[in-house]
């Protein structure tokens, strides 16, 4: 039973997707933070979802060149629903800009680096390690009781 629990917890920790939530607004003029700062502090994997929340705005996925130029004329993806969910389906950089005139130039743009699910890094270890620790603790309680 212990081994089965370890396997189930490890598998569930490694294959589940995550939903990242973001308030998609024009950054304040005096802000030193950017959406790229936010994105670089997150770990995005294939299958993860990003939820953009905004009012009277839009979000576009664009090419690298369109991102650099804040060009919204040919988006790969466009939404203006106020609550947009976007799923990452490839391990590539994704480029997002606001489709509202002038917003991208004011910093409402972001690059998201997405890695594959089988990509291993040191930050992937804690969920599995936590599952093993939890199972060990549970097993210890079983033998003590």
UniProtKB/Swiss-Prot annotation:
GO terms for cellular component: plasma membrane; side of membrane. It is a lipid-anchor; GPI-anchor. Residues 117-145 form a propeptide. Mostly expressed in leaves and flowers, and, to a lower extent, in roots and stems, but barely in seedlings and seeds. Keywords: Cell membrane, Disulfide bond, Glycoprotein, GPI-anchor, Lipoprotein, Membrane, Signal. InterPro entries: Cupredoxin, Phytocyanin-like, Phytocyanin_dom. Its main location: membrane. Residues 18-116 form the Phytocyanin domain. Coiled coil: none annotated. It is found in: Cell membrane. Residues 1-17 form the signal peptide. Glycans are attached at residues 30, 71. One of its GO terms (molecular function) is electron transfer activity. A lipid is attached at residue 116 (GPI-anchor amidated serine). May act as a carbohydrate transporter. PANTHER family: BLUE COPPER PROTEIN, EARLY NODULIN-LIKE PROTEIN 21. Belongs to the early nodulin-like (ENODL) family. This is Early nodulin-like protein 21. It comes from Arabidopsis thaliana. The gene is ENODL21.
């Amino acid at each position: 039973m212990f081994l089965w629990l370890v396997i189930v917890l490890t598998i569930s920790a490694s294959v589940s997707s995550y939903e990242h939530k973001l308030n998609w607004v024009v950054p304040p003029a005096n802000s030193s933070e950017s959406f790229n700062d936010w994105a670089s502090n997150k770990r995005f994997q294939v299958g993860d979802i990003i939820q953009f929340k905004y009012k009277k705005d839009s979000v576009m996925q664009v090419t690298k060149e369109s991102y650099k130029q804040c060009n919204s004329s040919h988006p790969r993806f466009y939404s203006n629903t106020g609550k947009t969910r976007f799923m990452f389906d490839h391990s590539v950089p994704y480029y997002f800009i606001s489709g509202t005139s002038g917003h991208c130039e004011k910093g409402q743009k972001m690059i998201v680096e997405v890695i594959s699910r089988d990509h291993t890094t040191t930050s992937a270890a804690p969920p599995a390690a936590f599952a093993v620790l939890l199972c060990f603790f549970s097993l210890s309680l079983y033998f003590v009781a």
